[in-house]
Amino acid sequence: MEQYEKEEKIGEGTYGVVYRARDKVTNETIALKKIRLEQEDEGVPSTAIREISLLKEMHHGNIVRLHDVIHSEKRIYLVFEYLDLDLKKFMDSCPEFAKNPTLIKSYLYQILRGVAYCHSHRVLHRDLKPQNLLIDRRTNALKLADFGLARAFGIPVRTFTHEVVTLWYRAPEILLGSRQYSTPVDMWSVGCIFAEMVNQKPLFPGDSEIDELFKIFRVLGTPNEQSWPGVSSLPDYKSAFPKWQAQDLATIVPTLDPAGLDLLSKMLRYEPNKRITARQALEHEYFKDLEMVQ
């Protein structure tokens, strides 16, 4: 740790405190994430160290770079490249963003590039949300933070400061208790983020797991064996769920053009293996005029 000098606390993430710090060797500003482990007394699990070490090999322009992993008996520090703006802060401070379909398209494309890269390396995120999409103010590059951390450390129900970890971007198969989920969970989150960029408000802002499910069902219809084969055998599925009819997405995201609505509907498919992949999404016609954008 001697190599890094903490300058100020910049946030409290899902896993612990985040500091802005300086690398004394290179004089570079970095983000230092202190991971608080659930079982404090047991020290750092070797599986977590292995998982995290793999993430150091991830190099992509749309992934926040993990420079270093420092671990002592009791805790882990992760050293990341430093970016001071995230998509949530950007949307909150810049309401006119919704009127810039070109920038929305560019950001969505970059999110998908980062997700496609991670999925091609068999790494899931599981907790994608606007707060962990970081923006470089100078270049408008968007980068995904915290990829792979869920597998190493699990996703707590509450952060270490007792804030509830958001459910707004969580895929229905996870909410219904599936243990067999895979890369489609991240594509669901991307769909929720896409709609939020366009509408300037969250698509499914549930405040509990059941409220989250019902907010989804009210828009997409309550799933059944016809719309989602196998749904009734998921652990937390109840035949007594209220039966809502699907709404037209065009009424939910009224300013999105037809190509965008088509892409969004493919991201928000109930059946995980029918959900569009990141690779497929990058080829979607919604992006056909992107060359002029970038």
Curated annotation (Swiss-Prot):
| Enzyme Commission (EC) number | 2.7.11.22, 2.7.11.23
| Residues annotated with Phosphothreonine modification | T14, T161
One annotated GO molecular function: ATP binding
What this protein is called in its record is Cyclin-dependent kinase A-1
What catalytic activity does the UniProt entry give for this protein? L-seryl-[protein] + ATP = O-phospho-L-seryl-[protein] + ADP + H(+); L-threonyl-[protein] + ATP = O-phospho-L-threonyl-[protein] + ADP + H(+); [DNA-directed RNA polymerase] + ATP = phospho-[DNA-directed RNA polymerase] + ADP + H(+)
Positions that bind ATP: I10, G11, E12, G13, T14, Y15, G16, V17, V18, K33
Q: What Gene3D superfamilies does this protein map onto? A: Phosphorylase Kinase, domain 1, Transferase(Phosphotransferase) domain 1
Tissue note: Expressed in the dividing region of the root apex and in differentiated cells such as those in the sclerenchyma, pericycle and parenchyma of the central cylinder.
